[in-house]
């Protein structure tokens, strides 16, 4: 079976600080290994990466059809219009690093843009995604509680939906 790992270093808010009460999106240096391939993005939106990975525990992700797995930006977070703060839509720019995630029974298939495929046991993939997501959530918890924008209900509800979706997916 194949190999997958992901980590983030130099966690910070967009202004470069280790704490920012108003910044909702965590950034950092993302490094993923898919087999022997190292994928690295110096200033990824790490909070979005973690949520996207949690989504891939139950959903396929096709390269270049949605947000990147290691996105540059996640500057807009909105609650999904079809639910009541249960899911979030994160919009960003087209820059970042992406790969495909497919499910075949108890195997996750990670496919790079060059066609390289790694086959990961679902339990191993899930453990790695949970480890990464838990690290990111711990960073949020180590910071001052966020001050949500009082004059922007859409962003406020988007942030609430972000964590609702995160916790639902993390606990399933």
Model-derived features with residue positions:
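Short, flexible coil/linker segments at or flanking structured domains
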Residues: 20, 41, 87-89, 113, ...
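N-terminal low-complexity, intrinsically disordered segments
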Residues: 1-84, 93-95, 99, 103
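Short glycine-rich, low-complexity/disordered patches
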Residues: 62-85, 91, 138-162
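Mixed-charge, glycine-accented linear interaction segment located at domain edges/termini
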Residues: 104-172
């Amino acid at each position: 079976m194949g190999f997958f790992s992901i980590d983030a270093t130099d966690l910070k808010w967009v202004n470069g600080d280790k704490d920012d009460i108003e910044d909702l999106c965590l950034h950092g240096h993302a490094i993923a290994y898919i087999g022997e391939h190292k994928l690295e993005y110096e200033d990824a939106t790490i909070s979005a990466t973690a949520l996207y990975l949690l989504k891939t525990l139950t959903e396929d992700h096709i390269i270049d059809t949605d947000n990147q797995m290691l996105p540059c930006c996640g500057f807009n977070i909105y609650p999904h219009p079809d639910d009541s703060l249960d899911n979030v839509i994160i919009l960003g720019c087209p820059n970042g690093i992406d790969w495909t995630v497919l499910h075949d029974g108890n195997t996750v298939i990670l496919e790079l843009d060059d066609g390289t495929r790694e086959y990961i046991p679902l339990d191993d993939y899930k453990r790695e995604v949970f480890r990464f997501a838990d690290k990111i959530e711990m960073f949020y918890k180590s910071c001052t509680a966020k001050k949500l924008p009082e004059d922007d209900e859409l962003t406020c509800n988007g942030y609430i939906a972000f964590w609702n979706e995160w916790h639902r997916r993390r606990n399933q």
